[in-house]
Swiss-Prot record:
Note on how the cofactor is bound: Binds 1 zinc ion per subunit.
UniProt EC number: 6.1.1.16
Main location: cytoplasm
One GO cellular component term noted in the UniProt record for this chain: cytosol
Motif ('HIGH' region): 31-41
PANTHER family given in the database record: CYSTEINE--TRNA LIGASE (PTHR10890:SF30), CYSTEINYL-TRNA SYNTHETASE (PTHR10890)
Protein name, UniProt field: Cysteine--tRNA ligase
Record's keyword annotation contains Methyltransferase: no
Family of the protein in this entry: Belongs to the class-I aminoacyl-tRNA synthetase family.
Residue positions binding Zn(2+): 29, 227, 252, 256
Subcellular location(s) of the protein: Cytoplasm
Cofactor(s) it depends on: Zn(2+)
Length: 488
């Protein structure tokens, strides 16, 4: 087994050797909870969930940390705006909402979206506001080592001195003189306009609840500092992988790396970044109306179909959304579930699952493993999955039950790794009967998702009615359709 991942810092695909044998440590940036989740947030979470699942499948015990930024200029500004006279709330906004209530409410929306799409809960999910003492300690370390200073204007701000750290710009391979000023505070208090805030002194008019006492005056932490302090608490001063969206490379991750290493921490061994989501080749923008939210996707398709779509591209590539994207994903999921449903119909509830026993599908499984080992190449892995589905269908048609069973074994392994078996709302038990029922119902829901995406409402209603007659209740919600069995 040789795992290889692209490291942004070295700009090359390198062999992944965990710092501790048999274990892996991963920190990836969660959301700044200032609004509803957008597809970029969820695509990132799915990418690092796939990574976690694959590392686990490869026998590593993985510790995952995903932070919550619950104090931020934008959160405070949004809360303040909600108290203004004449405030006109947009969907999801509440008049007169305190910043901490706003942050918590949106945090719960993110958790709902993650859960609906089968994103595994991290080992730790720390909030920035719960780690102020750790942030104070890190700032003091940087001051003591000559890499940070209190602001020159008595504002209570504390800044990182970028000129004091010769490696600043290493992650993104930029020359410091070519960088723009850090737009996080009044530059009059800085030695250099590029210096960034570690601590922000309280400003007039800001709520007292958004301020903490510190040796430099009351205030709140800077965004970049928060992540460095939290990752060090939960994973130590050196860990395996730091992940996040491509848009976080600069300034966020550049600043994280600089301040952590300047404090004497080796920090991340690998930096991994996922690509953005576009709309028909263009950057999504509310101003031009070319956006689609996870909630809107879940109104059009089942959670597994949405997960398939958001997770199907290579994590480093751009994922482009088109009006037909969910239809295509639904058709792919329907092919997988169609094979599984036919296999259950043939074999009953006895799957005969034996991990490693794949018969004629062994080559496809080996191709799947090779793809995932090679910088998490999900497109190649999906090709191997669909090849196995085709082989399984052929075996069923030919009456080759042994090969069909082994193809089913392979499909179960692959879908487990990709998170495509995580069905929100299913009643899960350990019985084979429940597993068989889930496969059959999900095959029907995938067909229904295709019908809905094509606006074939009569076909969609017919599938729902058939399931209802069989004792399966389907409910359409903001997080997509869920199902349950009728109660006696």
């Amino acid at each position: 087994m040789t795992l290889r991942f692209y490291d942004t810092a070295s700009a090359e695909v390198r062999n992944f050797v965990p710092l501790v044998a048999g274990r892996a440590s991963l920190y990836y940036c969660g959301a700044t909870v200032q609004g509803m989740p957008h597809v970029g947030h969820i695509r990132s979470a799915i990418a690092f969930d796939q990574l976690t699942r694959w590392l686990t499948h490869r026998g590593l015990r993985v510790t995952v940390v995903r932070n919550v930024t619950d104090i931020d200029d934008k959160i405070l500004a949004k809360s303040e705006a909600s108290f203004a006279s004449g405030f006109q709330p947009e969907p999801g906004e509440i008049p007169g909402e305190e910043w901490w209530a706003l942050a918590y409410r949106y945090e719960q929306e993110f958790l709902k979206a993650y859960d609906a799409l089968g994103v595994s809960r991290p080992t730790y999910e720390p909030r920035a506001t719960g780690h102020i003492p750790e942030m104070h300690a890190l700032i003091q370390q940087l001051i003591d080592r000559g890499h940070a200073y209190p602001a020159l204007d008595d504002s209570g701000d504390v800044y990182f001195d970028v000129r004091s750290w010769s490696k600043y710009g290493a992650l993104t391979r930029q020359n410091i003189d070519d960088m723009q000023a850090a737009a996080d505070a009044d530059p009059r208090g800085k030695r250099d306009p590029r210096d960034f805030a570690l601590w922000k002194g309280s400003k007039e008019g800001e709520p007292a609840t958004a301020s903490w006492a510190s040796p430099w005056g009351a205030g709140r932490p800077g965004w970049h500092l928060e992540c460095s302090a939290m990752v060090t608490k939960y994973l130590g001063t050196e860990f395996d992988i730091h992940g996040g969206g491509l848009d976080l490379r600069f300034p966020h991750h550049e600043n994280e790396m600089a301040q952590s290493q300047a404090a004497g921490h080796p920090f991340a061994n690998f930096w991994m970044h996922n690509g953005m989501v576009t709309y028909e080749g263009e950057k999504m923008s509310k101003s031009i109306g070319n956006t689609i939210s996870p909630a809107e996707m879940l109104e059009l398709a089942s959670p597994r179909v949405v997960r398939y779509y958001l997770g199907q591209a290579h994590y480093r590539s751009i994922l482009d959304y088109r009006p037909t994207s969910l239809q295509e994903a639904a058709a792919a999921v329907e092919r997988i579930d169609g094979f599984l449903a036919k296999a259950v119909a043939r074999f009953g509830t006895d799957f005969g699952f034996v991990e490693g026993d794949y018969g004629p599908s062994t080559g496809a499984v080996e191709a799947f493993y090779a793809a995932m080992d090679d910088d998490l190449n999900v497109p190649r892995a999906l090709a191997a999955l669909h090849e196995t589905v085709r082989a399984g269908n052929t075996a069923l048609a030919d009456g080759d039950d042994d090969s069909a069973r082994k193809a089913m074994n392979a499909v179960v392994i692959m879908t487990d790794v990709l998170g495509l078996n995580a069905v929100a709302g299913s009643e899960k038990t350990s019985t084979r009967e429940a597993e068989a029922l889930a496969v059959l119902v999900e095959a029907q829901l995938a067909a229904r998702a295709t019908a809905r995406a094509e606006k074939d409402w009569s076909a969609s209603d017919a599938i729902r009615d058939t399931l209802n007659e069989a004792g399966v209740v389907v409910e359409d919600g903001a997080d997509g359709p869920t199902w349950s069995l009728k109660r006696d």
